[in-house]
Amino acid sequence: MEKHLQLPLRFEGRTIPSRTVLSIDPGWKLGWAVFYGLELLEHGVMDFQRELGDMRRYKALWAHLWNLKLRHTFGIMLVEPPFGRFRSARNGEICGIIKMSAYESDIPVQEMHVLSVRAKLNVKGKKGALAYACQWTGNEHLSQHEADAICQGLVYLKEKENGKNSR
């Protein structure tokens, strides 16, 4: 039972269902993608060194995503855990802020490692994931972090469709 069931949100003339997914890929850059159903609503990337040197820019992005989707639709968030070569305090801090915000709002969080995402899509390495996301979106100008966030959301949604996710 949905705790905060509301009327569907309208965005650019389209009705957004009550279930949405925010997929986040933290690393040297923060890639994010917002899905509803298997349709990609929006995606982007933020550079930690330039845009996140001051946390106000990150908080502004978070407020935008929150107001656009999560506050209204109470969707599911995916956060790639801070593994791999980029193990900085900033990465862990951002993952912590995201998880804390989600838990306080009763939004379930599922962590999925980027390597398992790529394996489930049957792609090899970064270039394979980037090619998959570029082909799926029809956008040849995605960053690697955007591509990983998009692939992560797609894997979750496909598993949800097949009944493998209980949430």
What are these regions (language model features)?
Residues 1-167:
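Phosphate- and other anionic-substrate recognition elements at nucleic-acid/protein interfaces
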